[in-house]
Amino acid sequence: MIQGALHCDDTQRTLEGIQSLGAKVQVKKTRTISSGIRRPTTSNRSIDCGESGATLRFLTAISSASLKTIRLSCSRRLANRPLEPLVKAINSLGASAHAISDARGLEVLVKGPLRGGEVTLWGDISSQFISGLLFAAPLAIRDVTIKAEGALESRPYVKMSIDVLKKHGISIEESNGKFRVPAPQEFVPASHKVPGDFSSAAFLIAATGTVGDEITISGLGPYEFEPDSAILKLAPEIGLEVQQNGNSLTIAKRELDGFQFDASNNPDLVPPLETIGCFADGSSEIRGVKRLVYKESNRLQTLPTELAKMGAKIHAEDDMIKIEGSRELVGSALDSHDDHRVAMACAAASLGARGESIIHNSEAVSKSYPKFFQDLARLGVQLSVE
């Protein structure tokens, strides 16, 4: 049973995907109940992952444990994001996987069994490749060892995956950048309470930084399980006062100061922090950003481009973003580039800008935070949706 599951486009794609693999799922108001299966099965239709990268990567890996061919598809936009390292890893572990690209998008064909062995993946492209293989590895014929080559970025998300697997009775050994999963193993049922989503809440925190009003956000704990709660440690340095009361946070703005932040483990914090940096006194630097080119849009280009329309001065080079703060932003016609986090960052910046802004393709927020604009309205923001 899962309590507090997020309902958005991405999680809906995952839900439909696991149902196609044979799981029985009941979705209720506050909880989701799933009856598992010993091994993924096939369906007569392709699993449509839409634009959900996590769904595509996780279910591609899990499908490698099926004894029948599983078909997965995704949008053309998602097809441009990395998948080949995962496909190669699945083949190296004895299963069969190949991807076919055309004008409509991408189709992936996967068939097990996953025989086991050792595979190496670069750790600086997507941690979801490693998480996906960890989900599949217990169903392999023999032990699986996954080695992360180079720096493993977004390591906290791999740890989160391991914690979930351990709750389901799966044994995993980690040493010197290697993850060894004895196989075969059997999953046991477990219950989960999903912590609040700091990746989304960070945009409300950014809104506080741009306009200065105090806000309270509830339902965010326990913080130690959410990697993007790292923004709480940075907040005092930026000039945001944070008071914690159980699972609630109250955020108030003081004088904003320029800051430095390493986003290697928290790439989703870059858009809200980039927005805050525009209003801070002095310059700010965000490092560890090279993977932003692989997101829903190339965020190394798209967000600086949109904020520049408002008067922001942002420079992206190599693995760093530099933001010149203390600049007055002016409302403008902006575009989300169909990227949910760019849309929310533009909205947060617009709150502190002089004049009105229009955000085209703002519906992109439904990918992760469908009620974002409703929540802004509850906070007193004047907005209209056309």
Regions found by a protein language model. Give the residues of each.
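Short, structured segments at the rim of ligand-binding sites
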Residues: M1-E386
